[in-house]
Structures are given as C-alpha cells and as structure tokens.
Amino acid sequence: MQALLRISLVLLVLVVVLVASAPGLIYLAGIGSVEGRPQPDAPPLRPAQREWLRCELRADGRPEAPITNPWSYALRVLWRDAPPSYGDEMSWIIARHYNATHSKRQRAMERMLSGMSMSIWIARHWTQDQMEFQVHALLQDASRFSCQPGPSEWQR
C-alpha cells in the first residue's frame, strides 16, 4: 500500500513539473526553429507617425508592455481574458514578418509556436521605440490602411 502511495506521489510530482515547465520547453523549441534573430532599427517616430500606428493597431489608452515570458503567454492563451496589448501586437507583427523568411519549419503548428517564441524574444530584447519603428515601416509597405493621415501630418 505504501509503495503504491509513493509511486502515485512521484507520478503526481512528475506531472506537475512537466506541466510547469511546458511553456519554457515550448518556447525553447520554437525559438530554436528560427534562423538568427531580427536586429532592430531605433530612430524614434514623429508624433503623427506614432498616432497613425496606434490607430492602425487600434490601441487605446496608455501603451501596455508586451508579454515577456512563456508562462504569461500561456496564461493569456488559456484564459483569453484580455485582448493582446499594443506591445503584444507589435512584437507579433515583427515576429510574423521575420519568421516568414527565417523559419526552418513549414508546418502550421510549428510556425505558430516559433511565432509565439519569437514574439516573446522580441518583447524581451527590443525597446518600445524600436518595435514602433519596425512595425511602422512594415505597415507602411502594406497596400491597405484603415487610418489615413492628412497630407500635412507627415511633414511635422
């Protein structure tokens, strides 16, 4: 009876350790499937450019910091209690763009995991100004915009 209790306890501890370490292991697997890391450019945006970017990303209120660890990301995915923050959106856009040409794997689930991992990596290693500059450049290259600035706003 005691042997069965000990085995059950060991198995329970093992399951708890595996569940607790899963987000970190998934992060490592995802980041390992991407060649290299993106390098940021850092010129600050002009106020009109920042307003346009916030409009494009539908950011309201004060910018929130992006998620910077796999456990917080896992909790956000599991509970979905809040929409992605301004910082999360920016890091995801950069990660998606970078992984499109640097991912070692092509299956959808692997691309999604490497995108989540790269998004966390970018949030940890880039400043908000660097993310804003890169996302602004990427969205400016896109052919469609929902927020159109007036012609004089870009000269400020």
Segments the model singles out, each with a brief description of its role:
Residues Q2-R156:
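Juxtamembrane regions of bacterial inner-membrane/periplasmic proteins
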